[in-house]
Amino acid sequence: MQLLLNPLVGAISAGCTALLKPSPYTPHVAKTIEGLISEIFDEQYVAVVQGDREVNTLLFGMRWDAIFFTGSPALGRIVMAAAAKNLTPVVLELGGKSPCIVDRGANIEVAARRIAWGKTLNAGQTCIAPDYLLIHRSLQDRFTEAFARALHRLHGDDAQQSPHYVRLVNDRAFAVSYTHLRAHETTLHLV
């Protein structure tokens, strides 16, 4: 939701109109946002359109003053190519790598809490979610214990029952995560 609404704040602040196109992978969130936007704004200023590839194709064929896109690099290339036809300025939020570094001077409990929160927020499906941890070998065991405590505080004894523990958005996201885990299972230290 934040990836859709944060750019809207900038557009409104600049006096621009906006058309929001939420992800089809989160239909309940999209419907909620559409309802809120329609209650708050006249649709000539801010509107929401929903759909999948067909809607994207229609939108890509239109002339825009600017495009702010959040999503995959593959779709980002399509957005950029479509925008180039009209020399439309584009901001692409395509994610990246977000390492965490824990050195010997770090407060282990604080680091573990923050990393656990950042990685489990939205099932780690944000572009700023921690991807990997670089930690001094002497801190590995202390950190692992602190991280386990932090996860327990966030999600309780059974994460599956926690109202704060979210799930991966679809089977494809699960398959990608599973593939990464399997590829690195000999070097992973699982909590």
Q: Where does each model-flagged region fall?
A:
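General alpha-helical segment detector with a strong preference for membrane-spanning helices
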Residues: 19, 100, 140, 188-189
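Short connector loops/turns at beta-strand edges and beta->alpha or beta->beta junctions
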Residues: 8-11, 152-154, 186
